[in-house]
């Protein structure tokens, strides 16, 4: 059987060029169908080496490589979602209606919580007064810290993250995929025997801390936004053709 993939050769090459030789991953989805039209993980390897006489030696070399070329980072490497998570936070703020989206919060560039000082990425004097629209556009940390700790809380934040597919398999047609982590107070207690702290909520509000996702999770989240919440299962297989038949 011949397997026809959803990969678009032109976009695949563009993604490879954009990533270059930096260790990481790039993935492009077609929001209207879930088709994966580009998937890059670097470093990578030539699978043809396994058809040679010294395939066992080649495998051992790849397996021991500290840069892990056999790891498909698109679906099996975990990273903090960082500021992409503010998309989920914005959805939660609009849906829960606990804080008017046009009401402004001042960003002085930093905020004190307990005995810790959390600094916005722009530093002092900060972004000034921002509503939700501008806070998202400028990726203001202070705005989302305040909304996360004072209005949403860890349970709501985690629930919305799960609604966007975080913390679960996206069931792509590959042998395995890492689910990632969407932390809750219960999760932290089970894993570390530690209580959930306000600082933990600060961290997850901007996609940091214990939250971990794959690049595919983030691409899928943005596809859901494009589709107004509708989700399609990400997939690589377009069709299966029988080489003995005339497939046009």
Where are the regions that the model predicts?
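Conserved, well-ordered alpha-helix/loop/beta-strand core segments that scaffold catalytic motifs
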Residues: 1-25, 32
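Beta-lactam-recognizing serine transpeptidase/beta-lactamase-like catalytic domain environment
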Residues: 7, 31-83, 88-248
């Amino acid at each position: 059987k011949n397997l026809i993939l959803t990969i678009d050769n032109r976009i695949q090459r563009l993604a490879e060029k954009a990533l270059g030789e930096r260790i990481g991953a790039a993935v492009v989805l077609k929001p209207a169908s879930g088709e994966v039209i580009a998937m890059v993980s670097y470093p990578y390897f030539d699978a043809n080496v396994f058809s040679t006489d010294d395939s066992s030696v080649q495998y051992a070399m790849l397996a021991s490589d500290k840069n892990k070329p056999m790891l498909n980072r698109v679906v099996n490497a975990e990273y903090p979602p960082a500021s992409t998570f503010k998309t989920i936070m914005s959805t939660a703020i609009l849906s829960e209606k606990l804080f008017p989206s046009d009401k402004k919060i001042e960003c002085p560039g930093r905020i004190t919580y307990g005995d810790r000082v959390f600094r916005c990425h722009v530093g002092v004097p900060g972004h000034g007064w921002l509503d939700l629209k501008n806070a998202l556009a400028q990726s203001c940390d202070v705005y989302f810290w305040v909304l996360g700790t004072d209005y949403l809380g860890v349970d709501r934040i985690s629930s919305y993250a799960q609604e966007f597919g975080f913390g679960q398999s996206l069931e792509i047609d590959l042998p395995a995929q890492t689910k990632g982590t969407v932390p809750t107070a219960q999760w932290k207690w089970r894993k570390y025997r530690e209580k959930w702290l306000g600082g933990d909520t600060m961290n997850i509000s901007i996609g940091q801390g214990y939250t971990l996702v794959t690049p595919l999770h983030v691409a899928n989240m943005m596809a859901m936004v494009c589709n107004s919440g509708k989700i399609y299962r990400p997939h690589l297989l377009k069709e299966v053709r029988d080489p003995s038949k005339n497939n046009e």
